[in-house]
Amino acid sequence: MRKLTFFLSIAVLMATACGQRSSSPSLSQEFIPQISRSFGASGIATTRYGAAAPSLLGGGKITHVIIIVQENRSFDNLFHKFPHADSADYGETSKGGRVKLFPERLTEPMDISHTHDSFEVEYNGGKMDGFNLAQSRCSKDQDQGTCHNSDRHPYGYVPRWEVEPYWVMASQYVLADRMFQTNEGPSFPAHQYLVSGTSTISIHSTLRAAENAHVTGGGGQGGCDSLTGTTVRVIDDDGNENHDVFPCFTRVSLMGRVAEAGLTWHYYQAHLGHGIWNAPDAIRNIRYGTLYHTDVVAPQTKVLHDIAHGNLANVVWVTPTKPASDHAGVNNGSGPAWVASVVNAVGESPYWNHTAIFVTWDDWGGWYDHVKPPQYNSYELGFRVPLIVISAYARAHYVSHRQHEFGSILKFTEKTLGLGTLGTTDVRSDDLGDCFNFSAKPRRFKMIPTALPPSYFESQPISNQDPDDDF
């Protein structure tokens, strides 16, 4: 673990060399979190809100929020039979039968449709029995001879041994079994919800991006840098999807709220430009603003460097490469080790006592889940996805049974850092307060064992591949 004296000494050198603030704060500025510039005698950060910041959730103890987003897994698929969590042994079918959930590899070559239409088929008016009707297909990355289609396929779960780092994190800290994907569709709109609490196409519009963006002959797109002719299907309040727009939007974002508060953000992604998972590229004022070229960072492994060198921003999103994504049909099984690498980097750094880490999955990926999601409108809420909460103040060995959604992560960030509300789904969401005990002393970090070291991910070639066979 790097010592504070190391950070301070480096900061002195940097302060001497630099006459003005760069796009990334100095090490001392960043280690002493940016809503504070000093620590009180108690060790709690003092902020512009006053000593110990009593108005903030956590009293100012949390000054960094990291949102790690993986891909396409339902709760029942990834945490089957997790102790004290609500999981199922059997799944219902549209034929009135039951299917015993069965183990399937994380690297299973078949992908399951997870469009909004597929949600409606599987949800089946609240019966939760249409999963056997979901379409599956073999990924183009796979040997077609390894694919065996079946209406049982969506009822699979990933064995614990394949995702052991996730189970270790969930066991040591908090696992939420009532975390619902806010939207009822695939990755592109889901990532918009994770930064804006909505996928509306403009501030005053009720139309929401509902599907992945595509262009004929160009595969998966998404964002203001999308190829000419790219469109995304939108959904109206009545549930109609009969209108397409270019996927470049004008609306609020958490990045904007962070900047307004004088704090910092970084969005780490595999590649720059358009992409299904590259959420900032689809928000016009971010894409064409001054911070895009400094705060949207590629490749995603730079987060490890920034943590190690004291350049962690106040709010951080971390998205994966295709191989490390957990996305069915295209991943290579390295996702759990990738997430653990980021968590371990924070845990071994001076940031640990001031950071909250949220690990979630952007959508359910078509996989079975037995819990009926609440329905607020024509596009919210979607099926359950896992949420792991990791922090020195996270409750130990705790399963949260309270209802959460993507807006809950946004609301937690607003309330811990003193940000203005987005006025979207964060308003109705809870703040994840049940997952923390801020009156307790910060826990020491315990390394998460992994099969792959961080150097494995840092040595991978930069790739601009999204799962453009998403369907």
Predicted regions and their residues:
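Positively charged n-region of N-terminal signal peptides that target proteins for export
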Residues: 1-4
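C-terminal motif of bacterial Sec signal peptides marking the signal peptidase cleavage site
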Residues: 14-17
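N-terminal pro-sequences and low-complexity stem/linker regions of secreted or lumenal proteins
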Residues: 19-471
